[in-house]
Amino acid sequence: VKLSEEQKFVIKEIIKLKKSVQVLSGYAGTGKSTVIKHLVELLPNFAVCAYTGKAANVLRSKGMDAKTIHSLIYKAYTDEDKKVYFSLASSLDYDGIIVDEASMVSEGIYKDLKYFEKPIIFVGDHGQLEPVGDKFNIMSEPDYKLETIHRNAGEIAHFAEYIRKGYKPSSWEVRNGGGEKIKFVQKNSHKSACMNVDQIICAFNKTRAEMNSFVREKLGRKTSMPEKDDRVMCLKNDRLCGLFNGMQGVVREIYADDMFLFESENNALSIYYDPNIFNQVKYEIDHDQEAPSPFDYCYAITAHKAQGSEFEKVLVLEQRCDLWDHKRWAYTAASRAKELLYWCDM
């Protein structure tokens, strides 16, 4: 891949390692992965990792030996009852760390990464939404920015840029004709598109709860409680158990006493879940370490929860709210889709 001048400059500056923590930010389609690949070649003993297994898989598909942050810096141990726990590794056999999808890194994980006193390069996207309720945001002041969308970045990246600049999604169709990867859905027919996608993204929790109930009903679920093969998402970080806020997986078995086997991209864990959280519009999460883990269905999620994840086929239900910048919201939602994007103005 031929590097642009912008990419060359960024790579040249970063490898000088002038600061212990450097932040590189780039919009979707600016070639961040290409830059990471070159950094890995120039800094051979740097570990490459990402917050989710999904993001690590994307890097692996591009030829990098990527891990999740969790598998890189936490080590598993088993207690007398054969329960598996995780604790921070005592040392790291690398000269430094490159972290992709850095917008998802919480303050706690940031501190754990810094513990090893190695140079860290965070890579993320300053166009995405700011984390909700979290004052901490690695991407708020990047050292370097990639802002040129590459011609071959694909239709979805160009569409995401178009709406980030404030243009109406509906005018894209008029301007560009019907593309292969973006389909516009009429307001009343969004439910028919639901079952054709891997992820529904909306703005409001009320819509999220409604859409999750609708999809589960279509799938033949009999109760509001989790059943085998339900898709669920963890709602709080629990480093000890290896769970992270926003981590998606599938229920493989249901046990007595509100316990299920949760299979994520990393592993399968038997977990006590909180039955009162499912289908709630507003979550009342108990942050006590001893409390059962909060999960909810994730057929539909909000754009804030979708940050940093990528899905093959996505349905976006566009909804406006004064609490955040709508252009950033729409950009974040659109850029989650990899192969096919259905867009519905609600």
Where are these regions (language model features)?
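Conserved ATP-binding/catalytic motifs of P-loop helicase motor domains
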Residues: V1-M346
